[in-house]
Amino acid sequence: MTNIRKTHPLAKIINNSFIDLPAPSNISAWWNFGSLLGVCLILQILTGLFLAMHYTSDTTTAFSSVTHICRDVNYGWIIRYMHANGASMFFICLFLHIGRGLYYGSYMYLETWNIGIILLFTVMATAFMGYVLPWGQMSFWGATVITNLLSAIPYVGTNLVEWIWGGFSVDKATLTRFFAFHFILPFIVSALAAVHLLFLHETGSNNPSGIPSDSDKIPFHPYYTIKDILGTLLLVLTLMVLVLFSPDLLGDPDNYIPANPLSTPPHIKPEWYFLFAYAILRSIPNKLGGVLALVLSILVLAIVPLLHTSKQRSMMFRPLSQCLFWLLVADLLTLTWIGGQPVEHPFIIIGQLASILYFAILLVLMPTISIIENNLLKW
């Protein structure tokens, strides 16, 4: 008799995705982040669901309802901080996952890569709308500033912004619709993640060497299930250390002040995971130009596969490209730092140089250095 997990229509899908899946024998810990992102998503949906049971999306009670969750609901404080810091863990895993893809040439799987970019945009939208919900000062002014960027779109901009706001400013209508979208988007993310996985399983995983590994595959279970469990334990440990010892480390103190449309905070800035894009936005002294640069800072990832000029897939055996990759990492850290600084000298010029370098590395230097490496190897 055949095993039920191989014959049952539903169990068969799970079996082919997580049990009998042929996986390369040499994938490193950098391949753990896909499963960690899945864990983050499940954690966010669960904590978010319990928060939604006690949250009210009305401007008069939103701030109070979050306070109520933290003070009066059983273990409400831990659910709230797990959700807030879970978002940070989500983005840390996202950035490492994308970095892995860039380093090892995983972007050559075009469908998987492009679905990944759509996922990134969706998760960023979800996180932005979630940040608005507590209705603190930074929530309100962050929402005002970021939605206002759409007014830079020629001809339809102003109408578009007022349509999104549901009025002439960020108000009740805005908060209610943001809560609705923030609730539904994670489920859309889940569906997209399933499609992401579907496309990945069409080709199979890449591996650190970038060389096809069809001749050397091992079953996903038990080898990578146990490895993923270890990764999950480390992720949860890190998250809980953050939640239980310094839950407000990554937040903004201004968000503990209830939203006040009549008082602008001295420095409006988004959560840390958006600061790199915010720095690129601010480094261009023109509104429309800044918005375009902001969108392109993420969309540039879609062009990366088209600019792959190397004869090798992975950077494992390409020291010059490795140097450029780590320069890109340092540049992104610089942009993140600049995004949190006031708009004054010397931060303005540093931000502009870092922004230019970011696009230069991805669009010009990487393809050029790859050609040089090909020539050095007489390929």
Swiss-Prot record:
CDD domains recorded for this chain? Answer: cytochrome_b_C, Cytochrome_b_N
- Looking at the Swiss-Prot or TrEMBL record, what is one Pfam family this protein matches? Cytochrome_B
An example of a Gene Ontology BP annotation on this entry? Answer: mitochondrial electron transport, ubiquinol to cytochrome c
Give the residues the record marks as binding heme b b566: 97, 196
Residue numbers binding heme b b562: 83, 182
Q: Which residues bind a ubiquinone?
A: 201
TM segments?
Answer: 33-53, 77-98, 113-133, 178-198, 226-246, 288-308, 320-340, 347-367
- Cofactor: bound how, per the entry note? Binds 2 heme b groups non-covalently.
> Looking at the UniProt record for this protein, which Gene Ontology cellular component terms does it annotate, in alphabetical order?
mitochondrial inner membrane; respiratory chain complex III
Assembly and partners are described as: The cytochrome bc1 complex contains 11 subunits: 3 respiratory subunits (MT-CYB, CYC1 and UQCRFS1), 2 core proteins (UQCRC1 and UQCRC2) and 6 low-molecular weight proteins (UQCRH/QCR6, UQCRB/QCR7, UQCRQ/QCR8, UQCR10/QCR9, UQCR11/QCR10 and a cleavage product of UQCRFS1). This cytochrome bc1 complex then forms a dimer.
Tell me the protein's name.
Cytochrome b
Species the sequence originates in: Eira barbara (Tayra)
**Gene name as annotated:** MT-CYB
